[in-house]
């Protein structure tokens, strides 16, 4: 029997590249998308599903017998533009899948998503969202999401569902009919019987249940007319009541614990997000569950089809999970020791009785593998590596470090050095993250690993303006506070030189999204420092970024976030193209709904007009993630050639 039946053909084709080190083979190995994008386990524990990457941008949903490991495909998405986002078991015979993508709407690019149910044989595909009609008075952009998997009612789900009103074409009664906004429905996936649970509200943003089918929390998005303000109001219900009451105190509810009749809430504690348990019995009693004096608590961990909360997470030098459940805590520790090459354990889901656990085991440098653990037999079974082309490769270790900024503040970062080298006098890459209110976590990064495999030292700074470190670190964000953020990124390059890691004549900067913005702006701020610049899907003009939001409901939020005044000019790489002296290579998808391709079009034109060496590679039909093996392989090949000609390797 093949060891990994989920992708036998891919294994035969791709493992031949694992032992070689030419640019083309490195680009193919690291540019290939995750072989297994996601997995789930059925309530009985007898079946597994996997969303597997196919050729190019395609994805395939496969069903696997947990005992025999026999797998067969049931549906495929083309990625042009629809891609499978996720699939889960609603019962042992019924699945729910989300698919989505981006499409041109007039002069804008807008995202869309749809929910469907289907049998485990791939047949009887049915839409779960509101059916689209010619009389719709708005764009049917998102179907909604599954709110509760109703483990006590197999084959039914609770869905928060988006509704668009229709024009009354009969000429009788009101000119407009139907619901508008976000509501909650119970749906029987076999009969497709829909039972309304919460009437749609135009300003509703989301709901939370107790995992038992009871809607306990409603989040309202405040708006002025149709323009969102970015503020929210939270309401709750007491157990057994239908009356909405104002939620006591501030914070962001993450989950409802039915067992304790409480909500788990993120709220500020000394300028950092902490986790609280807030009673929903009318008392408003609030108890601190967890806080960290350096970083934010960022989420809760759920397990099982009832989505029971079993712990919480935060990231200091790596992502950490703290479990409430002592059995799960002990199990995670034991399993981490049982798989020493993958000490980090993330539980994905469990069978209804909890006897079988689906999990992902990984390390700082390796994306890892999916495993199935049977608590009854104590048997641990490897199901599938996340990235087949890398299973025979020596990957680079990721080291958490810190370095001083120009003002003496210590900046956390990650350093990835080429495996097997001396770590001295290397060509080096500064790789700022996107966001900007995101952060690097020191886990597997295919772009950083590719660069290390090509012989480059790579530093990934969590500059001021990054998320996860509290309000003071976030400050004005990486756009309004660009001088500080870019200064911290510059200090990362100078740190590598000061430690003898980097050859000062062979420094480059590479970034994606905000990271691409930071790469270009850094090259304008420090024209003598970098010898090459790579910007992937970059923001290049802050005023253009604001104007692109004009047709969307979050326009005021975007404009407030980016800011205004002279600094938006000085902080726009497009306006400073003449100051950039290093050659620039840009990549952008023309269906990018996050950062319009116009940013790169204008940037390359401005650079060429200034007499600079610049090139833009446009990818047709791809969005911000460039989630296509062929495109990513081409991009890495071009990056490797470009860097080799600029700073060597």
Q: Where do the PLM segments sit?
A:
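Bacterial N-terminal signal peptides that target proteins for export
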Residues: 1-6
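Beta-propeller folds
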Residues: 8-14, 19-357, 364-366, 373
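Conserved hydrophobic/aromatic "anchor" residues
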Residues: 41, 50, 89, 403, ...
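Beta-propeller and related beta-repeat scaffolds in trafficking/envelope systems
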Residues: 135, 242, 251-255, 376, ...
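Flexible loop/turn segments at secondary-structure boundaries
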Residues: 204-205, 272-273, 296-298, 317-319, ...
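Generic beta-strand/beta-sheet core signal
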Residues: 219, 237, 312, 360-362, ...
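Cap/lid segment of the alpha/beta-hydrolase catalytic domain
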Residues: 390-505, 512-513, 546-552
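Active-site-proximal cap/loop segments of hydrolase catalytic domains
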Residues: 463-649
